[in-house]
């Protein structure tokens, strides 16, 4: 680790102005279309970290790179193509492997910290 670089960063998640509009989900299921926004902390050739939030709704999702998630707020359910169910509440930690496919159904707006590993 380079000791000349300050790796620390602080953000108040309550401050909605810190989040940038990232648009709507790609493959919505139903009429309620989820809107996403986020805050990028760092990104390089091997990883990306940040905060992400999403409003209520359901969609088909495809995780293209391994992703670690620590959910901070909200309630949702992920169901893989193989039928594995991941119920998410505040405090849930999940890892989605590269090429994970399934659905996401958000019941209450979620916020998460994420780290994507470009593999």
Segments from the language model and where they lie:
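Short hydrophobic/aromatic-rich beta-strand segments that constitute the beta-sheet cores
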Residues: 61, 78, 112-114
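Conserved short histidine dyad/triad with adjacent acidic residue
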Residues: 43-63, 97-98
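Short acidic-glycine-tyrosine-enriched beta hairpin
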Residues: 82-98
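Short, conserved beta-strand element in jelly-roll/cupin
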Residues: 54, 63-78
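Short histidine-centered beta-strand/loop micro-motifs
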Residues: 50-51, 59-64, 80, 86-87, ...
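A short, N-terminal "cap"/entry segment at the start of jelly-roll beta-barrel domains
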Residues: 1-46
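Ligand-binding loop in jelly-roll beta-barrel domains
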Residues: 92, 98-119
């Amino acid at each position: 680790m380079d000791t000349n670089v300050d790796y620390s960063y602080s953000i108040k998640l309550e401050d909605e102005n810190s989040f940038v509009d990232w648009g709507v989900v790609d493959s919505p299921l139903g009429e309620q279309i989820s809107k996403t926004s986020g805050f990028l902390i760092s990104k390089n050739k091997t990883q990306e970290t940040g905060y992400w939030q999403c409003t209520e709704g359901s969609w088909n999702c495809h995780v293209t790179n391994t992703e670690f998630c620590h959910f901070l707020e909200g309630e949702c359910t992920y169901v893989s193509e193989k039928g594995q169910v991941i119920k998410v509440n505040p405090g849930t930690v999940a890892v989605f492997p590269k090429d994970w496919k399934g659905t996401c159904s958000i019941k209450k707006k979620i916020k998460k910290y994420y780290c994507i590993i470009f593999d």
